[in-house]
């Protein structure tokens, strides 16, 4: 839930106007909107590069994943792994635009550990792939923008652990 929605819901639940503190938080949210959109646009425009490079790094670091018997062995399973990385990158962009982790949590992280466990997917490898995406993505951004984006990647990585 964005800071705007959260503030309005809280104020309405108490039948009051928005407080000066809530208005300040909304003002900050609005003033950082252009930056958040710029970050999301950069990640979106570079998504293929980010996912491919992260996948290459993951498979180099974890060759067991793409070896016979590995969860991403074979062309089809490797493509499935890259599709999952792309999915998490998309969720990260949603969080960045919203300025909040709620879309990430509600759309894509509920039950994710259970799903991967049931499929026999090594969760540490998924987290490693997301960490690699974070590194590739952040290399495309300024230090300030990378810090902003990095926190959303970290949230997803944390959910995997």
UniProtKB/Swiss-Prot annotation:
Domain of life, per lineage: Bacteria
Cysteine pairings via disulfide bonds: none
PTM remark: Contains one covalently linked phycocyanobilin chromophore.
Subcellular compartments: Cellular thylakoid membrane
Binding site residues for (2R,3E)-phycocyanobilin: 81
One GO term (biological process): photosynthesis
Sorted UniProt keywords: Antenna complex, Bile pigment, Chromophore, Electron transport, Membrane, Methylation, Photosynthesis, Phycobilisome, Thylakoid, Transport
The keyword Electron transport is assigned to this record: yes
PTM annotation (N4-methylasparagine): residues: 71
UniProt cross-references to Pfam families, sorted A to Z: Phycobilisome
GO CC annotation terms, alphabetical: phycobilisome; plasma membrane-derived thylakoid membrane
Topology term for the membrane: Peripheral membrane protein
InterPro entries: Globin-like_sf, Phycobilisome_asu/bsu, Phycobilisome_asu/bsu_sf
UniProt subunit comment: Heterodimer of an alpha and a beta chain.
Entry function: Light-harvesting photosynthetic bile pigment-protein from the phycobiliprotein complex. Allophycocyanin has a maximum absorption at approximately 650 nanometers.
Family statement: Belongs to the phycobiliprotein family.
The protein's name in its UniProt record: Allophycocyanin alpha chain
Gene name in the database record: apcA
């Amino acid at each position: 839930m964005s800071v705007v929605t959260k503030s309005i819901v809280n104020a309405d639940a108490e039948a009051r106007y928005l407080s000066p503190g809530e208005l300040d938080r909304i003002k900050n949210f609005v003033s950082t909107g252009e930056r958040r959109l710029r970050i999301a646009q950069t990640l979106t425009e570079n998504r293929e590069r980010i996912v491919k490079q992260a996948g290459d790094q993951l498979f180099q670091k974890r060759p067991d994943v793409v070896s016979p018997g590995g969860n991403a062995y074979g062309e089809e399973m490797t493509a499935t792994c890259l599709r999952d990385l792309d999915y998490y990158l998309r969720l990260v962009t949603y969080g960045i635009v919203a300025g909040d982790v709620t879309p990430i949590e509600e759309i894509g992280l509920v039950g994710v550990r259970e799903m991967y466990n049931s499929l026999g997917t090594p969760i540490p490898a998924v987290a490693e792939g997301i960490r690699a995406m974070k590194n590739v993505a952040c290399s495309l951004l300024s230090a300030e923008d990378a810090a902003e984006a990095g926190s959303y990647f970290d949230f997803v990585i944390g959910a995997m652990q």
